Structures are given as structure tokens and as C-alpha cells.
Amino acid sequence: TSGTDNTAMGSGALDALTTGGSNTGLGRAALGSTTTGGSNTAVGRSALSTNSTGDSNTAVGRGALQASTTASGNTAVGKDALLANTTGSGNIGIGLDAGTAITTGNQNIAIGNEALLATTTNSGNTAVGYIALQDNTADHNTAVGGQALLQNTTGTRNVAVGSFSLDANTTASENTAVGYAALSANTTGANNTSV
């Protein structure tokens, strides 16, 4: 191997490294498949374990970014955070199962246990709060607050700020709800504003 400035601790950590540099793998199989990827940090069993050429990823927690192969610029903190991400880049998942199903989606932010739980290939979503945007399979939604936009599936360009705001919304788009339980009964109505 000609890689430099790498640190590995744990069975199988950084096991496949050839030329990658500035990687840190702590835990069983952490960064275990990395060959040429660089500037990655993996702490926890199987964190970033299938990463091969991805750069500048941070994974802290068992299974964090486990399926990532060539993705870059992701941050996952928490057990199984961004677990299924393979090639999606620029994602942030903080919390148990945060963004766990994202595979190829980009620029998603999931902060809170099970935030963005169902999102897979979608991009540009922000979910902050316990199970915020949990059922989401659409792009460009913003939910801040516990259970905000909880049931949203295909609705796009919605903004929900406050716990339970727009939590029953499923397919409606371009709604803005600010405040506790704002527009919480709305399911399919579009272009509504409640402040």
C-alpha cells in the first residue's frame, strides 16, 4: 500500500486500503473496503464498511453510512444513520435511523431519530425533529419540528415549521405551515398558507 496518514483500529478496519490517504477507521470493518478513498472518518462497527473510492465522509455509529461505495461529502452520526446510502453525496443524517433509506439522493438533511426514514432517491429535503418527514418520497420539502410533514409522500416544495405542522399532508405541494399543528389536518390541499 502507498496510502499515507491513515489510522485503523479494529478487525478489518481499512483492510483493503491501497492508495487512499488521511482516513481514520475505528471499529470492526470500519472503512474495510476503502481502496483509494481519502479524508474519511469512520467510528463504529461497519461504519463506512463498503466505501471504496468515496472521499470526505464522516460516519459515527454502528452501521452509519454502511452501504456507501463512491459517495462523497456525507455526514452520518447515530446507529444506522444514512445506512443505505450508496452514491448520494452531500447528505447529513444525525440520529438513530436518520435518513437510513437514502440510497442515491443528494443534499438531504435529516436531524432527529427516524427523520427522512422513507426517503430513497430524493434530494433537497430538510427534516429536523423526531420522525419529521418520515414517510417522504419527494424532493425539496422542509420540516422543522417533531412529526412535521410526517405523512408526506409525494408532495413537493412544502414548508412546515412547528411540531405536528402539516403532519397529515400526503400528496399536496407548495404549502406553508408555521406554528404548532398548523395545517395539521390538510391531506391533499395545495398552495395553502397558515401562520
Regions found by a protein language model. Name each.
Residues 1-195:
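Glycine- and small/polar-enriched repetitive beta-structure motifs of secreted/surface proteins
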